[in-house]
């Protein structure tokens, strides 16, 4: 399992915790507003909005909240916020790289809060470009293994995924334990998602992410704990949408941290 997969597994676990705190809801609503603003409020003609809505529904965001976010972003309802996307770069313990994606209406606030969270938790801010060059934009689709077909339980296999998506541009399928993660070129993410739907396979999320091209091994539990504390501190900021890292943490170390 690649370092990205291990981090992806952890992010899925963290998302479940964030959802309970309401943290994830706010991030999902922001994604919907931005997608509607950039491509229009009709999900049928705006695949980015379609996927943002589907992801929110999977996390049980109420339909009325989703509808309001679409209207605000599409200019059909007042109260919309003019967000901008900003990327910050940092290093953590043992040289681990962090790429921080923000959606904010206040650039100065976002910069100050990210810098404070990084420096107070054992990290250092990096020069622009020094970290981003270690990542590449990829299409990432997540599929839960346990599904239903014809009202009966159906466990999705890697072969099912490959058969459905290989011709659509899937490049790599990673086993995350309870789900599969499919990587493709960023431009192929909609094609991969559509191919899954055509095969009757449900998906959890489909989006473009930054994937590490060079992993940094983190085999010591105490160092891994510091890395996670740093990531948590940054990811919990209101302006932060995503934190990407190239930390490659072995399963046994991950389990000890989870415990």
Curated annotation (Swiss-Prot):
Protein localization: Cytoplasm
UniProt keyword annotations, A-Z: Cytoplasm, DNA-binding, Transcription, Transcription regulation
Main location class: cytoplasm
A GO cellular component annotation in the UniProt record: cytosol
A biological process term (GO) from this entry: regulation of DNA-templated transcription
GO function terms (MF aspect): DNA binding
Entry's family note: Belongs to the TACO1 family.
NCBIfam families per the UniProt record, alphabetical: PRK00110.1, PRK12378.1, YebC/PmpR family DNA-binding transcriptional regulator
Stated name of the protein: Probable transcriptional regulatory protein Noca_2383
Organism field: Nocardioides sp. (strain ATCC BAA-499 / JS614)
């Amino acid at each position: 399992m690649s370092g990205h997969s291990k981090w992806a597994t952890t992010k899925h676990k963290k998302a479940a915790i964030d959802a309970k705190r309401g943290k994830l809801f706010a991030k999902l609503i922001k994604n919907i507003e931005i997608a509607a603003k950039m491509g229009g409020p009709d999900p049928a003609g705006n695949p980015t909005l379609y996927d943002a809505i589907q992801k929110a529904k999977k996390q049980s965001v109420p339909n009325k909240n989703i509808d309001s976010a679409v209207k605000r972003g599409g200019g059909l309802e007042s109260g919309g916020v003019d967000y901008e996307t900003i990327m910050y770069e940092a290093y953590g313990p043992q040289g681990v790289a962090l790429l921080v994606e923000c959606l904010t209406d206040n650039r100065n606030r976002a910069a100050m809060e990210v810098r404070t969270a990084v420096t107070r938790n054992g990290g250092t801010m990096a020069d622009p470009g020094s970290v981003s060059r270690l990542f590449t934009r990829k299409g990432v689709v997540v599929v839960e293994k346990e599904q239903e077909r014809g009202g009966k339980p159906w466990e999705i296999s890697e072969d099912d995924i490959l058969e459905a998506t290989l011709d659509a541009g899937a490049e790599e399928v990673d086993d995350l334990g309870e789900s599969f993660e499919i990587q493709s070129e960023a431009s192929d993410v909609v094609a991969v998602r559509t191919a899954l739907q055509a095969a009757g396979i449900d998906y959890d999320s489909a989006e473009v992410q930054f994937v590490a091209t060079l992993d940094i091994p983190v085999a010591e539990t105490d160092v891994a704990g510091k890395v996670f504390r740093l990531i948590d501190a940054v990811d919990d900021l209101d302006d932060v949408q995503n934190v990407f890292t190239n930390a490659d943490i072995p399963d046994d170390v991950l389990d000890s941290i989870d415990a």
